[in-house]
Structures are given as structure tokens and as C-alpha cells.
């Protein structure tokens, strides 16, 4: 996509082409781009399309750190970055990664913010001034003396952003900064980015797959595929005009745009406010479904049953009075009781630090409970060896790099089978099947670190599936993946579930949970707050709010329509809303 040279542009990419040292294929191919000061740019595209590689060219992490072959020029404020040192570029470009833990170095918040300015050798007064301004910008003044390990995920990410702000860069690049955060933490970070762009005119480049939360913040959207920028324009314009092309790339429009178009709104320049969508729905449904007066529904509230445990159904996992304490005496789990049946597909929800991962980790004996027990197939898990547990339970960690260590994709998937002494022919069959299921067959000979994070996530899952466990525990398995791959992946997991596999999904993505999980468990501060069918749990706004969660848009609309007196079911997805409207002869636009 050629653009005329603009000497006034803040950033120019000129014919950027790049290949990693361990691959002959181009990750970036003849990219031409210019950015103006104060722009808020949303960078989208399928996993592995080159987004992360592109933004690492801003501060020469590519190729100085990654190696490989880079041709073309990146120019910032007229300076050719080939002539600049990486450490000096920190003054021009701030970089925030997916996992804040990778760039937090100090014990306390204010110390971490001071780290960069101290390394510049600035006077003490200047360092203090920058730290104070950064604390104010990220709204963590009251936590400046707190230890970083005590912060929530959102607070840690804001601290990472604050550390960059203390360097006073003109450009801030963020590579999926909300991917590991709960909805509350995501709101914190996105609100901060909005303020930084509006008040300080910092140029923002944001890589993000979760378009629902970010598309209205950006004033420009770039879409990449196969190392090239293929779309460049206003977010609303691209999302509305290029829906077919985007869906082929695995990029799905935000729910508010989908629903607005269904109801006949023009979304070319903006989406209508939630209140207008609700009003239009009420007008369309008035003739057929308004069977109750608002007052009669005013106090209606879905009841959330305790853990589902029909006695005639054998438990796959039974958790009894499970508690866990840290060394400092604080409780991470408090008297948890759950009964999980064979073949269930359930989701564990809750804010960062609610105890979801800790609870799931107890299944693999990663933690030692202070009291209580867990039965797997009716047998106490303390009686299983680690090898036996690994054959019974497939566990996917939040960070795929925690369980990837071989030199090729094929060898990675083969590793567990080899340790189990599976016959060679059977081993090859399982490896090939798992790679095909995760759409990684073409990468079988590639080094895992040459894959994108989303692809590495799928590789970790393939390694698990090859072992053929009966229980799958997936801790944020969709991190770093585009919507298309997410749906393909979870469709495969649902197929396995229908074949009898039990699935426990830990996620912060309410839309995906609403679409795939049959049962939802919400945790807060180490306790089970809600447990029941997904439709009922998502119609409990007060409890969800207390847990820092936001129900999907269709569920919120259903709840508010009920409050107005409409007899509507609990709708969780856009397709369920479509079906409901069609059933009541409401004319909609597909």
C-alpha cells in the first residue's frame, strides 16, 4: 500500500520487509505506512499476520534483538532508526507487552516508575517529578508504596504503562495489553489510554483482538494479513463496509454493530447508544411480547442454583470443602464445594485473583490445600502419580511458553507420547491428528518460537490433545488469537466435549463463555459466588458486577427488556437474539 512521502509525518515506514533468522518466509512484506502525531491507531489482523513484528520495528527490537533480515526504513521525526541505538529509542517510543510481569522490575510501584528515568541519569528532582506525573496519569497515587506482587492484573498493566510514561515518549505501542486482564482491568487500561490520547496527545498504536472494547476509542484502523497492511481507514467504515473480508480473516464485528445493523441503524460513522438500541427493540416487540406490565417484572430476579449434582450421575471431579492459604496466612480458596459430571462443559469466571487458576491448579496438585480434598473418578488425587494425572487431565497454562520447550512443532507434540512409550505408528498418528485439529500441520518442522503467540497457544493445546485425556482444563486458551481461530478452536473443543470429554474453561471473554459453556461458575475472593446454567448466571447483574464482570450485550438487553415488562428469554448471543426476533415476526436485516 504505497503512500506519498510526507516529511511532516511523525512516523514513516518505507518498504519494510522482514524475515526471522530461522525462517525463509517473509513476516513483513513491503509495508508502507505513515502516522501523524496524536493518532489513536487500532492494529488488527489474524494471528501470525505480522502485527507484533511490525510494532517491534518502532524501537528496533526487530531486528536488533530478534535478528533476521530487515530491509526498508523506519523514520521517526525525520530520523532514520537504522542510525539510532535501541536504548535511546525508549525516549521516543514506549512499548507495553501482553504480560506486564515481563517489564516490571522493582518491588514497589513508584520504584518501577523511577527505573527508566534513573537509568537516564536524570537529576533527583526531575525523577520525582516524572514519577508523580506518571502516578497521576495512571491513577495509582494511593498505591505508590504498594508491593507490585499485591496489585491486580489491571493495576500491574497500568504500572507498566506508567513506567513508559515516565520516559516521556511521543509514541506508545501496546501489544494486546488487555489480553490477560478481566473486564474490570480491561476497562481500567482502556480508560487510561483514552485519557492519554485525548489529554496528552500521545500517539497510540494498539494491537487488539477484542474489538468490542476498543473500536470506538480509535480514530484509525489498520488491518494486516500475511505481512501486509490490506485495509486502512476509520474503524466504523472498515467494520461496516468490509465485513465479508474481515470475517474471512477471522475478524468479527463488535456485537453492538451486529445488533445495530439487525435493527436497521446506520453504523457507517458511529454505533447508536445502548439506550437507543433498547428503545428500538422495545418498539419492534411491542405488538407481540409485551404481556406483562413493568411493575410485575420489577422485582423479578433469576435464581442461581447451587452446584449441579444429580445423584444418579457419576462425578468426574468432586471438590469437597477445599481451602488454601498462602504462607502469609491469606486465603486463596475458601471452603469450595463443586461437583463436576462426566461430559460437562463449564466455565470458571471471576476477576484477576479470584482463585480460578488456583482452583484449577489443585486438580494437578500444583498447590497443597490447607483443608479439604479432591476426588477424580472417585479416587483422591493424592493417590495418583504425576504421570497418571497427566494422562487423566490435560492442562493448558495461561502462558503457552510455560509448556513449550522442543526445537520443532512436531517434536513438541511428540514429546509427551514418547515419554509414555506409545508405539511409533500410533505416536505419528496422534501427532498428525492433533496438528491438523489445531491447524498447525504446515508448521510441523518450524521452531515453536517462530510462531505467533496465538499459534504457540494452539501448539500447547495440540500437545495436550495428543495424550487423549478425558478432562481438559483450559486456562485462558484464546489469549492472543483472532476470532476466527478462537471459534475454530472452541468448535473442536465442543466436538470433543460431545464425544464425552469434560471441559473446564477459564476465561475473561464473556461472549465466548456465553456461546460455548453450558454451566458457569463465578468466583470472587476464593469463593464460589454463582453456579448454574449460563443463561441464569448472565441474568444476575448485581452478582456479576460484584465480581467485576459484564454480561454479553444480548443478555443485558434481555434483562432490561424484562424490567420493562417484556416476556423474553435469557438471550446470550446475537444468533439467539436473531432467532427470537424471527420467531416473533420482527423484520430484521441480515
UniProtKB/Swiss-Prot annotation:
Keyword annotations from UniProtKB, A to Z: ATP-binding, Cell membrane, Membrane, Nucleotide-binding, Repeat, Translocase, Transport
Chief subcellular location: membrane
UniProt binding sites for ATP 1: 45-52
Residues that hold ATP 2 according to the record: 350-357
SMART domains hit by this protein: AAA
Record's bilayer topology term: Peripheral membrane protein
Localisation per UniProt entry: Cell membrane
Keyword Membrane found: yes
Molecular function as annotated in GO: ATP binding; ATP hydrolysis activity; ATPase-coupled transmembrane transporter activity
The EC number(s) this enzyme carries: 7.-.-.-
A cellular component term, taken from the record's GO annotations: ATP-binding cassette (ABC) transporter complex
Pfam families attached to this UniProt entry: ABC_tran
Stated family: Belongs to the ABC transporter superfamily.
Summary of the function given for this chain in its UniProt record: Probably part of an ABC transporter complex. Responsible for energy coupling to the transport system.
PANTHER family reported in the protein's UniProt record: ENERGY-COUPLING FACTOR TRANSPORTER ATP-BINDING PROTEIN ECFA1, HEAVY METAL TRANSPORTER
Full protein name: Putative ABC transporter ATP-binding protein MM_3016
The species this protein was found in: Methanosarcina mazei (strain ATCC BAA-159 / DSM 3647 / Goe1 / Go1 / JCM 11833 / OCM 88)
Phylogenetic lineage: Archaea, Methanobacteriati, Methanobacteriota, Stenosarchaea group, Methanomicrobia
Amino acid at each position: 500500500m504505497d503512500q506519498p512521502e510526507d516529511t511532516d509525518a511523525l512516523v514513516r515506514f518505507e518498504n519494510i520487509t522482514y524475515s526471522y533468522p530461522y525462517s525463509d518466509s517473509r513476516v513483513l512484506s513491503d509495508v508502507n505506512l505513515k502516522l501523524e502525531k496524536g493518532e489513536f491507531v487500532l492494529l488488527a489482523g489474524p494471528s501470525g499476520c505480522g502485527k507484533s513484528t511490525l510494532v517491534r520495528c518502532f524501537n528496533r527490537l526487530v531486528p536488533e534483538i530478534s535478528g533476521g533480515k530487515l530491509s526498508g526504513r523506519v523514520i521517526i521525526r525525520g530520523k532514520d532508526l537504522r542510525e539510532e541505538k535501541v536504548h535511546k529509542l525508549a525516549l521516543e517510543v514506549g512499548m507495553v507487552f501482553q504480560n506486564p510481569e515481563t517489564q516490571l522490575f522493582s518491588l514497589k510501584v513508584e520504584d518501577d516508575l523511577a527505573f527508566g528515568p534513573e537509568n537516564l541519569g536524570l537529576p533527583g528532582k526531575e525523577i520525582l517529578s516524572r514519577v508523580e506525573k506518571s502516578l497521576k496519569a495512571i491513577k495509582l497515587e494511593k498505591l505508590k508504596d504498594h508491593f507490585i506482587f499485591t496489585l491486580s492484573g489491571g493495576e500491574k498493566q497500568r504500572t507498566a504503562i506508567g513506567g513508559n510514561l515516565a520516559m516521556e515518549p511521543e509514541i506508545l505501542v501496546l501489544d494486546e495489553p488487555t489480553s490477560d486482564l478481566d473486564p474490570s482491568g480491561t476497562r481500567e487500561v482502556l480508560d487510561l489510554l483514552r485519557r492519554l490520547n485525548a489529554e496528552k496527545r500521545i500517539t497510540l498504536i494498539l494491537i487488539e483482538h477484542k474489538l468490542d472494547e476498543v473500536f470506538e476509542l480509535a480514530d484509525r484502523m489498520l488491518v494486516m494479513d500475511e505481512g501486509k497492511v490490506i485495509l486502512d481507514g476509520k474503524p466504523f467504515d472498515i467494520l461496516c463496509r468490509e465485513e465479508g473480508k474481515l470475517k474471512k480473516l477471522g475478524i468479527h464485528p463488535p456485537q453492538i454493530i451486529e445488533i445495530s445493523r439487525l435493527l436497521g441503524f446506520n453504523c457507517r460513522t458511529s454505533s447508536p447508544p445502548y439506550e437507543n438500541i433498547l428503545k428500538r427493540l422495545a418498539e419492534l416487540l411491542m405488538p407481540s411480547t409485551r404481556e406483562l406490565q413493568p411493575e410485575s417484572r420489577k422485582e423479578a430476579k433469576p435464581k442461581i442454583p447451587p452446584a449441579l449434582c444429580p445423584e444418579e450421575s457419576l462425578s468426574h471431579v468432586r471438590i469437597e470443602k477445599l481451602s488454601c492459604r498462602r504462607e502469609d496466612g491469606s486465603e486463596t480458596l475458601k471452603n469450595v464445594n463443586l461437583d463436576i459430571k462426566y461430559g460437562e462443559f463449564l466455565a470458571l469466571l471471576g476477576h484477576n485473583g479470584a482463585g480460578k487458576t488456583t482452583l484449577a491448579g489443585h486438580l494437578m496438585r500444583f498447590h497443597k490445600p490447607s483443608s479439604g480434598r479432591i476426588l477424580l473418578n472417585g479416587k483422591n488425587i493424592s493417590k495418583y502419580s504425576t504421570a497418571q494425572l497427566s494422562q487423566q487431565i490435560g492442562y493448558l497454562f495461561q502462558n503457552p511458553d510455560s509448556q513449550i520447550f522442543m526445537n520443532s512443532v512436531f517434536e513438541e507434540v511428540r514429546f509427551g507420547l514418547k515419554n509414555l512409550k506409545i508405539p511409533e505408528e500410533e505416536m505419528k498418528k496422534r501427532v498428525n491428528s492433533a496438528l491438523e485439529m489445531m491447524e498447525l500441520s504446515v508448521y510441523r518442522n518450524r521452531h515453536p518460537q517462530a510462531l505467533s503467540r496465538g499459534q504457540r497457544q494452539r501448539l500447547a493445546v495440540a500437545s495436550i490433545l495428543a495424550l487423549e485425556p478425558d478432562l481438559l482444563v483450559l486456562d485462558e486458551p484464546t489469549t492472543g488469537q483472532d476470532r476466527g481461530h478462537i471459534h475454530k478452536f472452541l468448535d473442536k473443543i465442543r466436538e470433543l466435549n460431545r464425544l464425552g470429554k469434560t471441559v473446564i474453561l477459564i476465561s475473561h471473554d464473556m461472549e465466548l463463555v456465553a456461546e460455548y459453556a453450558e454451566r458457569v461458575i463465578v468466583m470472587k475472593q476464593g469463593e464460589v459466588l454463582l453456579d448454574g446454567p449460563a443463561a441464569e448466571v448472565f441474568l444476575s447483574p448485581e452478582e456479576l458486577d460484584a465480581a467485576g464482570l459484564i454480561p454479553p450485550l444480548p443478555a443485558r438487553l434481555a434483562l432490561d427488556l424484562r424490567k420493562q415488562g417484556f416476556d423474553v428469554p435469557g438471550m446470550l448471543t446475537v444468533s439467539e437474539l436473531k432467532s427470537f426476533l424471527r420467531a416473533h415476526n420482527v423484520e430484521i436485516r441480515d
